[in-house]
Amino acid sequence: MRIIGGEWRGRKIEEPRGRDVTRPTTDRVREACASMVMSAFDFDLDEVRVLDAFGGSGALGIEMLSRGARSLTTFEIDRNAARLITKNIESLCRDRSRWRVVTGDVLASASRGRVPGGPFDLVLLDPPYAFGAEPVEELLQNLSQQGLLAPGAFALFEHAAADAGSHPACFK
């Protein structure tokens, strides 16, 4: 897998092995997501604080860092996947103040207000397909109630094709 744009364009990153670990977002979808985000922030991510709530391979969050995001906080519940995300980011970004990887459950952490790095301007939501919209809505509500979302925050929710048209009620 490669970074598609920004400072680290073309650089390789590793992805977790095993069928049940993650399902990395394809290059085409990552490019579309990055284009939407860049457009939403007038092509300037310099002050954008990013939360990658379900890290997986880490590719979406790393893509935002590559394109200039101020900071990235990535949550990943699987220890091995979290280690790999850390390794990938370390190979690209030496400025440790710009990123952190948290091994843990973002839903539980958000409900207790324990999500470092906020308030967030951009929340990347690419949960396991089995999640559906309900836990994502709960996560966003908790982030908002805990003061972890910046005014006008942008959330990008990737979901199964079968769920097309559905979205958390709190999305505009």
List the model feature ranges, each with a label:
Residues 1-172:
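Class I S-adenosyl-L-methionine-dependent methyltransferase catalytic core
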